[in-house]
Amino acid sequence: MNRIRYCFELVSVLFLMFTANARARGRGAIDFDVNYVVTWGQDHILKLNQGKEVQLSMDYSSGSGFESKSHYGSGFFQMRIKLPPRDSAGVVTAFYLTSKGDTHDEVDFEFLGNRQGKPIAIQTNVFSNGQGGREQKFVPWFDPTTSFHTYGILWNPYQIVFYVDKVPIRVFKNIKKSGVNYPSKPMQLVASLWNGENWATSGGKEKINWAYAPFKAQYQGFSDHGCHVNGQSNNANVCGSTRYWWNTRTYSQLSANEQKVMENVRAKYMTYDYCSDRPRYPVPPSECRWNQ
């Protein structure tokens, strides 16, 4: 009898913990309109689940996009995204940080569609002071079109880290002392769905099949974990304080375990690295030896 009572009480406790966690997750979901605003393709954007989810769509007439109301100088930015299914060659779904102007800074996640049955590419890139050309591509180890997956960008004074489902896949370190520019301008968080058929799939050889339009991508997770800064400023260094958790020593470099996990992912799933592209860069860019 005591054993039965114990089992019943244990199940009851676990149930209460589950429901409490579920409620906490519900309270943590932020409405899109709190931190973001639609910037283009207004008639191609649909708010779902009481504003907790946004669907971007693209047809022959237009794509769509949104951006954060605030500018940031550092932070940890995440978005849950489900990509367009079926034949999406030429279609680009994006999630990135960017400043404005010819000498802009930018930190990119771009998801490059493909023919049905072929893998979508996860492309990352870093622009600093207008200089990009730092593409690295990965094949996801899951189907990004059937469910939501979390994509994250850590940006602090020490490093930029790209995450997929909390797994680090790329690091770009701040090595300004070695003459390599590092993103330091106030940036906004941007998401978009657009026509990239001139370059996105097989170098632009595979064009969009409009018979599959409208293409749709869903976004969730509109919380705000960044240091707000004046968008008119050219300096985000005011956001380097360790009073922000993402700037503390813990996040100044990957742990030994994170480094090992990242190396494993890169060995198995990275399909292109600008640092290894000798026809393009006969001499590898100087930051490459620091970011392996």
UniProtKB/Swiss-Prot annotation:
Q: Where in the sequence is the active site?
A: E106 (nucleophile), E110 (proton donor)
In chain numbering, the residues marked as site (Important for catalytic activity) are D108
User: How is the polypeptide modified once translated?
Assistant: Contains at least one intrachain disulfide bond essential for its enzymatic activity.
Q: Kindly list the positions annotated as binding xyloglucan.
A: E110, Q123, T124, N125, G133, R134, E135, N198, W199, G203, R280
The record, for InterPro entries, names: Beta-glucanase/XTH, Beta_glucanase, ConA-like_dom_sf, GH16, XET_C, XTH
- Keyword Secreted applies: yes
Q: What is its EC number?
A: 2.4.1.207
- Please state where this protein is localized: Secreted, Cell wall; Secreted, Extracellular space, Apoplast
Name the principal localization, coarsely classed: secreted
Where the record annotates domain GH16, the positions are 25-219
Q: What is this protein called?
A: Xyloglucan endotransglucosylase/hydrolase protein 2
To which species is this protein native? Arabidopsis thaliana (Mouse-ear cress)
